[in-house]
């Protein structure tokens, strides 16, 4: 059973398994199982760590003519080592059990927690990007027109002034956000991030993730899809180390309001 995992029907597998699937998902699955997802963005740079090597450096699975076939070396270990086989199946079963709390009809589940690197995979990005490089948002030609936005609501007192943004909720539907430090509206990154917003023809899909503070670790709560409010983008500046630094502010509105219990856990105000 380990040689051929299953044959893709391409049409109908979503109905059989009740899961969200399209061509981008299938390509992403291939890249993860072949470990290409973990290659460095600049493969010619010898200083870039090849994360593929962390996972053995070999494809776990090969996808040929619509059939996923397990790597022969991996299959041999499973056939000849009962302890390894048991541990392998425990991991698979644990993953399936853990997946039951997620909405299988959508890439992301509102109210669940995700690390920035997990979101890379779930949004079908071509490569894994480190959380440090993603920062508060990330867009590139390899992110399939998606733009996840990450907000740490209460900033620690000892963090750098350059990342001490004053993001805040206006209400359970709307949030005021900031770009990364040093950005200008007329520059390439901001033009790409807000392309089509004022014309009502947004180019990107935006996803909002929030955590209360860094005490919660590296994961953020997914609050849902959102859109940048028309004409909300403003060029501003902040005084950092005695110098005025440019920054862009903008407002986003969620398609669905934040659950009130969760909302007040962020803003720190008790309901009457």
What are these language model-derived features?
Residues 1-10, 14-15, 107-219:
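Acidic, glycine-rich low-complexity segments with interspersed aromatic residues
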Residues 213-272:
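Compact mixed alphabeta submodule
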Residues 7, 11, 15, 25, ...:
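Short linear sequence elements within intrinsically disordered, low-complexity coil regions
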Residues 19, 97-102, 120, 147, ...:
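Generic recognition of cysteine residues
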Residues 1-87:
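C-terminal helical accessory/scaffold domains
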């Amino acid at each position: 059973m380990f040689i051929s995992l299953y044959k893709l029907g391409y049409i109908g597998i979503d109905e059989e398994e009740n899961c969200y699937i399209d061509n981008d998902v299938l390509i992403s699955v291939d890249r993860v199982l072949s470990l290409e997802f973990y290659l460095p963005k600049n493969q010619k740079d010898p200083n870039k760590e090849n994360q593929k090597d962390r996972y053995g450096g070999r494809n776990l699975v090969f996808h040929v003519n619509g059939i996923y076939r397990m790597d022969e070396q991996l299959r041999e270990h499973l056939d000849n080592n009962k302890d390894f086989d048991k541990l392998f199946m425990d991991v698979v079963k644990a993953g399936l059990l853990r997946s039951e709390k997620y909405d299988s009809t959508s890439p992301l589940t509102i109210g669940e927690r995700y690390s920035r690197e997990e979101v890379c995979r779930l949004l079908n990005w071509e490569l894994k990007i480190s959380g440090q490089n993603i920062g508060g948002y990330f867009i590139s030609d390899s992110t399939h027109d998606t733009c996840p936005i990450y907000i740490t609501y209460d900033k620690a007192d000892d963090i750098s002034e350059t990342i001490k943004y004053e993001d805040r909720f206006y209400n359970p539907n709307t949030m005021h956000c900031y770009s990364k430090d040093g950005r200008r509206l007329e520059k390439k990154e901001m033009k790409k991030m807000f392309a089509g917003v004022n014309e009502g023809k947004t180019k990107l899909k935006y996803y909002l993730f929030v955590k209360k503070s860094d005490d919660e670790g590296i994961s953020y709560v997914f609050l849902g899809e959102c859109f940048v409010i028309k004409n909300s983008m403003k060029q501003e500046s902040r005084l950092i180390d005695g110098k005025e630094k440019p920054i862009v502010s903008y407002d986003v509105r969620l398609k669905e309001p934040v659950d009130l219990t969760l909302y007040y856990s962020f803003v720190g105000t008790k309901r009457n």
